[in-house]
Design a protein with these regions (language model features):
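N-terminal amphipathic, basic-rich helices that act as targeting or association modules
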Residues: 1-6, 78, 99-104
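A mid-to-C-terminal "edge-of-domain" accessory segment
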Residues: 7-9, 13-69, 321-380
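Alpha/beta enzyme core
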Residues: 53, 58-63, 75-99, 118-122, ...
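Active-site beta-loop-alpha junctions enriched in small/polar residues
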Residues: 69, 106-110, 132-136, 156-158, ...
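N-terminal active-site wall of soluble small-molecule enzyme domains
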Residues: 107-132, 136-142
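Short hydrophobic alpha-helical runs that function as membrane-insertion/retention elements
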Residues: 128-130, 152, 291-294
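Catalytic alpha/beta core domains of metabolic enzymes, predominantly
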Residues: 233-379
Length: 380
């Protein structure tokens, strides 16, 4: 770390602020696995350091979709026609203001490429069609000439992945990632860097230094570089005062404050292993992240992703209105999954299950007969 004690007036906060430490890559010889937090033979620990960061919700927040990427990794793949049908419904759900802003596609199979091309032919502005690749030269060749503007690039950032999966050092991993990202920029693409396993990563030893390098590359090239903070194992914690690497507020605040990542270049990708996908996604919004990544009905790896429909209603509650989104499409999507895809949605799933607003308790039924507002969440 290099200290700089200059004090300047911030144009963002209108307060005098001391210039920040510049965090440098810590190229350690042994992996940092945070065994005191993740002992593996026990339930992970939630530790506190009582450092609180301010809420800073962006003016514009939006939803992105990974149903055709992460959503397909956990189930029988969709057919080309099913992806086209679902994409049309996502377009209607997101409305004219594009609150459902983007969706991402695999490009490894002919079926996925055909679906991508057919969806592009529809000419919709939203959801913008993007892709996902690994940080390899061969994967990059798959996307550089297919007409998309933005591609996701997998950049695993925890030592679990860098040391144990990829058999690299942190320095080698960063150099590899920066090489592929630079190639994407040279080909005219906007990179979206997926910081895999960020909630088990050495935040100040790798995450912030890497994000800082990406922001330098963005400034030098004039190309926006987005960072998707991926809570790959669902370890993220929303509670104020929780220590890194599990703190969602701390992760978002640090990427903005220490690495200089703008809110509109930040996105959160959550998993539901500890039932926290929705609250962590909302927390990411509240602390400065513009985008939250979701999948239809939360279908995704293991316990799934953040349900898209849940974030539609989180958006409405936080912003005060739907901003053009058409929530009737959510019911159409549920019916399509049941009838056309053959996917069973549990009856008590919020907003989409057949019984989500059904009551069988006698005292509740009595209340509903007297006034339906007593036991209905709103006029659904």
């Amino acid at each position: 770390m290099k200290a700089n004690k200059t004090i300047n007036l911030s144009t963002k906060t209108n307060l005098l602020e001391q210039d920040l430490y510049e965090y440098k890559l810590q190229d350690v010889s042994q992996p940092e696995l945070f065994r005191e937090i993740f002992p593996y033979n026990e339930v992970p620990k939630v530790s506190y350091n009582y450092r609180h960061v301010p809420m800073d919700m962006p003016e514009h927040i939006y939803i992105t979709d990974t149903s055709f990427r992460d959503g397909q990794q956990s189930r029988e793949p969709y057919t080309t026609q099913q992806m086209v049908d679902l994409y049309k419904m996502l377009h209607r759900l997101g409305g004219p203001n594009g609150i459902v802003r983007q969706t991402e596609f695999f490009v490894y199979s002919k079926k996925d490429r055909d679906a991508l091309e057919r969806c592009m032919e529809l000419g919709y502005e939203f959801p913008e069609i993007t892709t996902w690749i690994r940080a390899t030269k061969s994967d990059f060749e798959l996307v550089k000439n297919i007409g998309i503007r933005e591609t996701g690039i997998l950049v695993s950032c925890s030592d679990y992945h860098i040391f144990k999966k990829m058999n690299l050092t942190r320095k080698q991993a960063m150099e590899k990632y920066l090489g592929v990202i630079s190639d994407a920029i040279e080909a005219g693409l906007h990179p979206r860097c997926h910081f895999e396993d960020i909630t088990r990563a050495d935040y100040y030893g790798f995450v912030v230094p890497f994000a800082t390098e990406l922001m330098k590359l963005s400034k030098d090239s004039g190309v926006p570089i987005k960072i998707r903070a991926c809570d790959t194992m669902g370890y993220g914690i929303s509670y104020p005062g929780v220590s890194l690497p599990r703190s969602v507020p701390g992760i978002i605040y640090g990427l903005k404050h220490y690495a200089g990542v703008p809110s509109d270049m930040l996105e959160w990708h959550g998993h539901n292993d500890f039932y926290k996908a929705v609250v962590n996604s909302t927390t990411a919004w509240l602390y400065g992240c513009s985008g939250v990544n979701t999948s239809l009905f939360g279908i995704g790896e293991r316990t799934g992703n953040t349900p898209l429909e849940a974030m539609v209603f989180e958006y409405a509650q936080l912003k005060g209105d739907l901003n053009g989104m058409d929530t009737t499409v959510i019911t159409e999507l549920a019916e399509y999954y049941e009838k056309e895809i053959g996917y069973h949605i549990p009856e008590r799933t919020p907003f989409v299950g057949k019984n989500f607003n059904v009551t069988r308790a006698g005292v509740h039924a009595d209340g509903l007969l007297k006034n339906e507002e007593i036991y209905n969440i709103f006029d659904t």
